[in-house]
Each structure stands twice: as structure tokens, then as C-alpha cells.
Amino acid sequence: MQTAFDFKQIDLRAIRDRLSIQFEKIPDRERLDPVSQFVCSFLGSVTPDSISWGAFARLVMRYQNWDAVADAPEADIEALIRSVAYSEKKAAELKGALRKIRASYGKINFDFLVDLEIGQALFQLEQIQGVGRKTAAATLNFSTLRGRAFVVDASVLRVLRRFGFVGANASTEAAYDAVMAAADDFDADDLYELHWQLKSLGQKTCARVQAQCASCPLSDICLQRVEEGAIMVTQASACVA
């Protein structure tokens, strides 16, 4: 019986090539500036992209700049982002985050991140209340910074756990560290593409409640499928978030 699936023993480029056959090539969308990406990713925590993008668009249409958001009443911010999960909490934390950035650096921008190593940049971002590894990494990798950081969201984490690449209870930070160690030859764009491929796999095939193991291009190297079978993976899906 297979007892572990170690990405370090497998060429991640080969994994990406397999997923490229299953899914269309990920288009490189127009990048947001770092602060705008930060706000968008902040809103997107535990919220589908389509909903968080709508909330982000409403903020952009209502306010001229992020200074205006920082100075706006929390109730007004919350009303615009009410569709996202934990909207009241996010409204307060987003306002606080923008004000903290302005107080620390004199203005609301992330210019200082350009000269920092990725680890230092992640650390600085994660000092902001409400910011975890996913939001910090997305700010760096998805924005015009194009930083070499891998974004682990709920769908990606679920796939990595099921594969056995990380433990069943591994944190986002642990999954990030494991991927970055195994993908030491990947540049920022490679990590960007891998994220969206694994996210697509998690949403369309390795779904939370109804995993479609038979159609998964990576099923032969999936620890949970090998050990439990496709039926058990489907039944256990709700427990492996």
C-alpha cells in the first residue's frame, strides 16, 4: 500500500503538464496594484471569487481611493461588502488595515515590499490584523509585484491534503512551506499557474462534497484514493475541507 505521496519525488512541472491537459491554459489576467490586490484577497477569505470580486468592485465604484475607504464609516463599508463572509468583521479589519498601513508608511501603498525578500514581505503583511498566509501570498504573487509566493486557498489545501502531500490537518502555512520547498525551481509565474490549476482541480474534480476521482488526472498518485477508494473519498469529502 502506498504510505506517502511526496511531491519532492515528482517533477512538479510534470504535474502541471498533466493538469494542463485537463484544464485550459490559465490566462494571465491584468494584474492589480498590490494594495488593490490586498483588498480583493482580504475580502475573498472564505468567500467565492465571484462574490468577493463583486464586493471589491462596489468599493472601487463608491470610493475614489483607498484613503477614502480608510476614512469611511465601518457601517458604510460593511453595507458594500455585505455579500462576503463575516462582512462586519472584515469591514472593521479592512478599515483598520488601511489606516495602519497609512500610519506606518505615510501613505497607503506597498512600495516598501519591492525591496524585501519574500519571507520578509510575508512577515510584514501578516502583522496586519486579519491577514493570514493566503492573503499575504496573493498580495505578492497575484499583483503587479509578481512575487515568488504560492497561494494556498481552501480548494488548493484540500487537494494537497488528500494527495498526502501534507498531513490531513496541515495548516495553510505548512502547505505553503511544503510547496515552496518542492518547487524551488519555479518562478513566480509558474507558481501562479500551479495555484490556478490546483484550484480548478479542487473546484471541478476534487470537490469538497462530491469528489470525481474517476475523472481526476492525478488519481493514480492520490494517497486518499489509493488507501480509501473513490467512494470513501466522496464520503469523507465534507470532513476534509
Residue positions per predicted region:
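Catalytic cores of DNA base-excision repair glycosylases
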Residues: 3-236
